């Protein structure tokens, strides 16, 4: 029997993009990367665990900020190369900038315009020197 993780088309680095989506509203909250271990742990623990490429280690979303993502459903796209996590974003903040979503800029009139407010000052969320969860 084929392992469910083997059905995923991992990139050359053994990663797959993962989109976190609010399970009630459908709003896209963020995009991060997952490897086999992080996806297996996410399914086992029902909380989002990603792979941090910059730190080269597992990234348990919310372990520094308290803004955990409780996973309600895991979906795989038709090409088996993108994951969607339907999550409950605890604390209402997914972005390390203190916003609800990492997608807070809109392209208008030839420039990127910030359209989402900062809900909480990142300095009040993170320990010194640890901004990008």
Curated annotation (Swiss-Prot):
Binding site for Zn(2+): 78, 95, 102
Reactions catalysed, as given in the entry: 1-(5-phospho-beta-D-ribosyl)-5'-AMP + H2O = 1-(5-phospho-beta-D-ribosyl)-5-[(5-phospho-beta-D-ribosylamino)methylideneamino]imidazole-4-carboxamide
Biological-process GO terms, alphabetical: L-histidine biosynthetic process
Keywords, alphabetical: Amino-acid biosynthesis, Cytoplasm, Histidine biosynthesis, Hydrolase, Magnesium, Metal-binding, Zinc
Keyword Metal-binding: yes
Catalytic activity, EC: 3.5.4.19
Required cofactor(s): Mg(2+); Zn(2+)
Top-rank taxon: Bacteria
Residue positions binding Mg(2+): 77, 79, 81
Keyword DNA-binding among record annotations: no
Pathway info: Amino-acid biosynthesis; L-histidine biosynthesis; L-histidine from 5-phospho-alpha-D-ribose 1-diphosphate: step 3/9
Chief location category: cytoplasm
Annotated GO MF terms: magnesium ion binding; phosphoribosyl-AMP cyclohydrolase activity; zinc ion binding
SUPFAM superfamilies hit by this protein: HisI-like (SSF141734)
Broadest EC class assigned to this enzyme: hydrolase
InterPro entries: PRA-CH, PRib_AMP_CycHydrolase_dom, PRib_AMP_CycHydrolase_sf
HAMAP family assigned: HisI (MF_01021)
Record-given protein name: Phosphoribosyl-AMP cyclohydrolase
